[in-house]
């Protein structure tokens, strides 16, 4: 019975990207954090090491394979944390790839979608903007008002685009 189960497992494969085929998973479902360059934290689904770079991977369950800006930001935050904290988290320092992957599962299929990650400077700029809005030192100024987003925003009463 044991051999039967293990043979079924060895036949199951996902269409891994080239960079990940020979890589090892060094972190899985792990909380990550850093205080530098700004305080950041998150829970990364997987981090792969192919001997040259660390690759961040986050799994999303979706009807269609798609990447959203929030996915890129999330993976980029993990990249910034790992650049600073890989020694502490995995026991050695390794550069983090400027690309990551969104692993999209749904309806019996799995796809790995490559994304270009934001730089540390861009992540810090987003962090600063978030806190400017949160502490009301800046006003929101979206290009377009989106009802689903704007109705939950605490900046809506002061926003020039929100008129619902």
Residue ranges and their predicted role:
Residues 1-30:
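Acidic-basic catalytic patches of nuclease active cores, encompassing PD-(D/E)XK
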Residues 11, 60-64, 116, 134-137:
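Context-gated lysine
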Residues 43, 51-53, 72, 97, ...:
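A structure-centric signal for secondary-structure junctions around beta-strands
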Residues 23-41, 84-164:
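Metal-dependent nuclease catalytic regions and adjoining charged, substrate-binding loops involved
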Residues 71-84:
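Short, charged, amphipathic alpha-helix that recurs within catalytic cores of restriction-modification
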Residues 66-73, 118:
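Short alpha-helix boundary/capping segments
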Residues 40-65, 76-78:
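Conserved catalytic cores of phosphodiester-cleaving nucleases, focusing on short active-site segments
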